Amino acid sequence: VQLDLGGYLYLTGERGKEPLKLPGSQPDYLTGLKASAAIHIALWERDRSGSGQFLEMSMLETLATLHQFTMEMTTFEGVLRMRNGNQWQRESSFASYGITTLPCSDGYICFGISTEDQWERLCAMIGRTDLIDDPDYDTRIKRADNSEYLDTLVTEWIADRTRQEIFVETSEIWGLPTAPILDMAEVVKDDQFRYREIFYDQDLGDSQVVTFPTYPYIASKMKPNIGLPPSLGEHTEDFLATN
């Protein structure tokens, strides 16, 4: 309901098709983050002026204030942003080719091409430098208008490669912003996340281990303190003995 009224579901999905629901409980998470910021600002103001204040938080208002350039497109450019799958909306001044998600041999890879230099490197990578000076592709808008054909060319280049092979070659050799799309099992095992210790493995006993997320930051003097709630009846005897 909050995503509907806040204007987000209208933007999510394929062009010409029904809106799609976002996974998880995004309004709850986002409102909690904004509430944390509001509380810290209020505490800072209390320390500065000695005056407290009453805070109001709304999931709906949180979503409505997160639209950024979507609102600018509507009110300044007169362009109503709409569902456009994994690409920029062509009617927008932000339109460009290269922000797209394409299939490869073992899943999907996301490209974030947005500048002229990146476009030229993409053309060189797929062996189509002739496109750089082609009048049909010499502006961002023209490339966006021909995105289906360009998707076909890039897909031919990546089709037989794995996500990791594409990620390494595009980022390390060509300096292009790309990323493999990972599922949660892959995220939990990711070497970078494990090195940064943002996940916590909790032993449940009986050889059962569950992984929890911790915090998206690392503080030099703080470590997450995560534990389990008591099991059923775990403290019953101690409680009755003292009461």
PLM regions and their residue ranges:
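A broad structural signal for alpha-helix termini and local helix breaks/kinks
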Residues: 126-127, 174, 243
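Acidic, glycine-rich segments within the central catalytic cores of soluble metabolic enzymes
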Residues: 2-168, 197-207
